[in-house]
Amino acid sequence: MELKDYYAIMGVKPTDDLKTIKTAYRRLARKYHPDVSKEPDAEARFKEVAEAWEVLSDEQRRAEYDQMWQHRNDPQFSRQFQHGDGQSFNAEDFDDIFSSIFGQHARQSRQRPATRGHDIEIEVAVFLEETLTEHKRTISYNLPVYNAFGMIEQEIPKTLNVKIPAGVGNGQRIRLKGQGTPGENGGPNGDLWLVIHIAPHPLFDIVGQDLEIVVPVSPWEAALGAKVTVPTLKESILLTIPPGSQAGQRLRVKGKGLVSKKQTGDLYAVLKIVMPPKPDENTAALWQQLADAQSSFEPRKDWGKA
């Protein structure tokens, strides 16, 4: 299996902290998201960045990955390696650690009559927009071939055309019967499990079946009310901002969230009041007039009150 340089993919150093890596991830996710990027390889780069983040954002996975990367060129790596506690590390453990990072289960086989083949688990990145309808996907994975000692002797590339149903959720598992490793002595094949990973979106956050989007509005739009154009997963809509709206206020748009077999979620627009740039003399005078007209308004009067 190829061990990718996740730090290089993220443009960070192995010594960088999680905050730095998270910042790099958010920047790259926005840069390469297919809805935003015009680069021809944007989707592939986006999935690569998401894969790197999946490992580096988890403290245990990152530690295991760092250990593997350090010894990647060691010819004895797959046979004799040392855990941090000094215990022996052999090829059986290698599969366990590698699967903990890449989400694959390559368990050591045992010689038994009519033994069932191993299951294989792979992660499939799905964009939010793709969850609305059933779509076809071509997936590629490696089919392990085990020797008589239950160790992986080689891996055979395999490609399948699969259907991803509408309404899939993050972490959902889809079973493809018989697409795992072959059974032994007439035993049934293992299964292939597709684990759905909903890719981060530059605009929407997922909250259960609902979606949240931050909607920037001007102070006068919040004060006077307005109608603003807001994107949804399907199309743009005209959202009514009520007069006197506050920063952080949530406006519900029914039926514009995620779709599943049981229900359709809602979209919540979270208002963010954005101030204009530093005012010139004329604009400052207008703000002062407003301040004078609202001199009795005290925004901090309820501080410290239950």
UniProtKB/Swiss-Prot annotation:
Keywords: Chaperone, Cytoplasm, DNA-binding
Superkingdom, taxonomy of origin: Bacteria
InterPro entries: DNA-bd_curved-DNA, DnaJ_C, DnaJ_domain, DnaJ_domain_CS, HSP40/DnaJ_pept-bd, J_dom_sf
Molecular function as annotated in GO: bent DNA binding; unfolded protein binding
Name of encoding gene: cbpA
GO process annotations (BP): chaperone cofactor-dependent protein refolding; protein refolding
Alphabetized Pfam families for the sequence: DnaJ, DnaJ_C
Domain J: 5-69
Function (record text): DNA-binding protein that preferentially recognizes a curved DNA sequence. It is probably a functional analog of DnaJ; displays overlapping activities with DnaJ, but functions under different conditions, probably acting as a molecular chaperone in an adaptive response to environmental stresses other than heat shock. Lacks autonomous chaperone activity; binds native substrates and targets them for recognition by DnaK. Its activity is inhibited by the binding of CbpM.
Protein's UniProt name: Curved DNA-binding protein
Disulfide bonds, paired cysteine numbers: none
Principal cellular location given in the protein's record: cytoplasm
SMART domains xrefs: DnaJ (SM00271)
GO CC, one annotated term: nucleoid
CDD domains: DnaJ, DnaJ_C
UniProt-annotated location(s): Cytoplasm, Nucleoid
Source organism (scientific name): Escherichia coli O7:K1 (strain IAI39 / ExPEC)
